[in-house]
Amino acid sequence: MGQQGYKVIEGLPSQMPYQVYYQEGVYAVRDADGRERPLKYYAVIPTQGNPMGSRGNDSLRFPTVVYCQGSGWHQQWLWHHFAHHVRLAERGFVVVSVEVRPYGEMVFPGEVDDFLDAVQFVHEHAAELRVDTTRIAFWGDSSGAHTALMAAYTAEAALMPRCVVDWYGPADLELLSTQRSTMELHGPESPAGRLLGGIELADHLDLARKASPVGYVAPDATIPPTLIMHGGADPFLPFEQSVSLYERLRDANKEVEFYRMEGDGHGGGAFDNVAVLDIVEEFLRRQLG
C-alpha cells in the first residue's frame, strides 16, 4: 500500500480491445397513406479511438451483424437487445439493428423487403458504418428471426449473408397452423395470421408455405450456415418450429447448428447469459472469418 493509502494495481492486460460509439438514423422512407413513414436504424460500432471524440483509424472495417428485433410483427422496440449488441461491438463487430414495418402497415413480404433495403443501406454506407461488406451476418429473435431467415434464404447474391442466427423464430407456418400454445398462433387475429393479411393459416396453406423459411430449403438451394437456438419450455412459440427447420436443413445437407435451451422460454433466461453470447460469437467468427 502506498503512503497515501492507495492500493496498487499493475500489469493487467486490456480485456476490452474496442471502445464503441452509437449512431442512429433513417435508412428508408415509405409512403403510408400519403404521409412519410421513416424506417430507423441504430448502429453500435467498434473504435480504437475515443468514442467521445476522434473515431480513431477510419480505415478499419469490421465483421457486421444486421439485426431484426422481434415484436410479434407489432411495432418494434429496437433497443430490447441493446446490451447484447454493445457487448458484441466491444468484441469487434458492428451491429446494426433495423426497424421494419409492423402488420397493419404492410403484409408479407413487406417486412422482408424492408430488411433487405436496410442491408442495401448498410452496403452503401459501409465506410461510414465501418462495415466489411464481405463479412455480413443476419440475426433476429422471434418474429425478427423469421424476417432474418426469410431474407437470408431469399436474398439475391449481392445481399446474401455469410450466415444467419435464428433465436426462437417461427420457421414453418404450415406446421404452426396445427399447433397450440398459451397464445393464439394461427387465427385471423394471431400475429402470423395478421402478417399474412388477417387469415386463418389452415385455410391458406399455400400462402403459409410461401411465408415459411423451411419452404426455401432444398439440396440445390443456396442457404447460408444457420445457428438455431430455442427455449425448450417456450410457452408462446412451440420448440418444434425450430426442430422443423433443423431437420429440413439437415436433410438438405446444409450447415446448421441447433441448441435447445433446456427449461427456457421465449427469450430471457439463458438468452441473457454471456455464455450464450459466446456461442453466437464463436459461430460468427467461424463463418465470417
Residue ranges of model-derived segments:
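Alpha/beta-hydrolase superfamily serine-hydrolase fold, recognizing
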Residues: M1-G289
